[in-house]
Structure formats: C-alpha cells, structure tokens
Regions:
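A short, Lys/Arg-rich alpha-helix, primarily the initiator
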Residues: 1-15
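Short alpha-helical "recognition helix" segments of helix-turn-helix
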Residues: 20-21
Length: 68
C-alpha cells in the first residue's frame, strides 16, 4: 500500500483522515491502523471502493495506492 500517495490525495481534496474515516465506516484509530498496516491491518475491498468514491480516484490511482 502506498500510504503517502493516499495522504497526498487527501491533501488535494482538502480532507483529513478524520474526515475520510467515517465516510468509509471506520473509526479514526482503525483507519490509521489500516493506513499504517499496523498488525497486518488492511483495507477491505468495500473500504477501498468507498475511498475510491469519496476521493474520486480513477482506476490507475486506486491500483497504485492499494495494490502496488
């Protein structure tokens, strides 16, 4: 996962992790754990889809952030 790219997209959209987390259905602490892959935590496919929608990511951006 490319956390820096995701954080950059958040900045482009003038959003914070605290703004995005509830829109994905996560608490801020759980979102951060998944963002930092703490303890092997990963975003689920439904969470990736929600992030893609909220941040208006295209397919290439989504793949670069979550699957590279």
């Amino acid at each position: 996962m490319n956390a820096n790219m995701l954080k950059g997209r958040l900045r482009e959209k003038a959003m914070t992790q605290a703004d995005l987390a509830p829109q994905v259905g996560l608490s801020l602490s759980r979102f951060n754990a998944k963002l930092n892959e703490t303890g092997g935590a990963e975003f689920s496919l439904s969470e990736v889809r929600a992030i893609k929608r909220v941040l208006d990511l295209d397919q290439e951006q989504t793949e670069q952030i979550f699957f590279s």
